[in-house]
């Protein structure tokens, strides 16, 4: 391959690997836009755009996604590594972009719009279905079978787990009770301002009852480790649908400071996860391992079982609300205005 083909292939790999929000491809597009229009950077010198390009990217992301990347600075800077988009490749794309009047930028934003059209089609399932005809296996398959959406399947898993767990706990009326040990009354009186402000208890109010709740952390974790959900009754939940290594298993458990961890995984991963956890001595910290088959069974009962009237609609409501937060819809009219405002419709096609 020649240099142009290598640079283009690097770009395509980044687009293919990107989650639905396409943060890194958008950052590349905005670097190329600044180079083409304002001519205020040197593509061979990444220090002229490494940090400022995150701000350029964020302007676009806020406009069309309503959010910005929450990944670590190191992970974001990995964009310019030799195995991603090093300056020499970016410089080649810049030259091609100028010759085609923004053709590379146009190519990236077309991919962005295609990805969101794919997402819209998949998400329409959750809006058009009722408890009678919503099937979890069908919903997940929409993401597994679409290459452009497969990278976002982890967030979809989080959403369906959260929707089920939180709906059942709410419908069951689970309560959490907190009591102060009155044998430590002297300590309580000394730190009564602390207990009153932090745990809403004092010497006159020594117990508190709360509704049990599960909360999503809701922040994309680039390295796929750590906490996905937590409960106010001491449980931590880690969603794990990808292949698990011994190192990753140890990272998952050691990065969550709870001794009641619930892991959700595919059936094919269950034995491997148990084996790895036993090898590293962390099995005792795992409260339970739940498989996709368990989720499908529970969804069928919750949506169409004897008690479906108590939880069915609530589950779908949670799914829709979380999807809106995780995958905000792009305004098609605004995007088309942006596309024509930059005259990407007049740019030459880099694939011809």
Curated annotation (Swiss-Prot):
Presence of keyword Flavoprotein: no
UniProt catalytic activity: Endonucleolytic cleavage of DNA to give specific double-stranded fragments with terminal 5'-phosphates
Enzyme class: hydrolase
Gene Ontology molecular function terms on file: type II site-specific deoxyribonuclease activity
Keyword match S-adenosyl-L-methionine: no
Database matches in Pfam families: RE_HaeII (PF09554)
EC number: 3.1.21.4
GO biological process assignments: DNA restriction-modification system
Highest taxon, organism lineage: Bacteria
Keyword set, alphabetical order: Endonuclease, Hydrolase, Nuclease, Restriction system
The protein's name: Type II restriction enzyme HaeII
Gene from which the chain derives: haeIIR
